Each structure stands twice: as structure tokens, then as C-alpha cells.
């Protein structure tokens, strides 16, 4: 359990460095683009699955 706490602490420190630095603004733009790409991929695979039946 202490191992998981240490891992989450390290992840929180890394997230804080990115959040309080200037990297977060660029990362949000990349995340928005990736979100829409994966939504399109999801819809295409969903339609292919429906058509297959």
C-alpha cells in the first residue's frame, strides 16, 4: 500500500510541474485533437459493427 502511495505521489508531482508550467496549454490542444480523432474512430468502428450484423 505504501508503494502505491509513493507512485501516486510521484505522478502528482509530475502533473504539478506540467500544470504550473507552460506545458499545460500545449497539452490541452493536443488532447482536444486526439479526443475528436478517437471519437471519429469510435463512430466508424461502431457503424462497421452494426453493418456487419
UniProtKB/Swiss-Prot annotation:
The chain crosses the membrane at residues 5-25, 30-50. GO terms for cellular component: plasma membrane. It is found in: Cell membrane. Pfam families: DUF1328 (PF07043). Signal peptide: none annotated. InterPro entries: DUF1328. It is a multi-pass membrane protein. Keywords: Cell membrane, Membrane, Transmembrane, Transmembrane helix. Belongs to the UPF0391 family. HAMAP family: UPF0391 (MF_01361). This is UPF0391 membrane protein Bxeno_A1464.
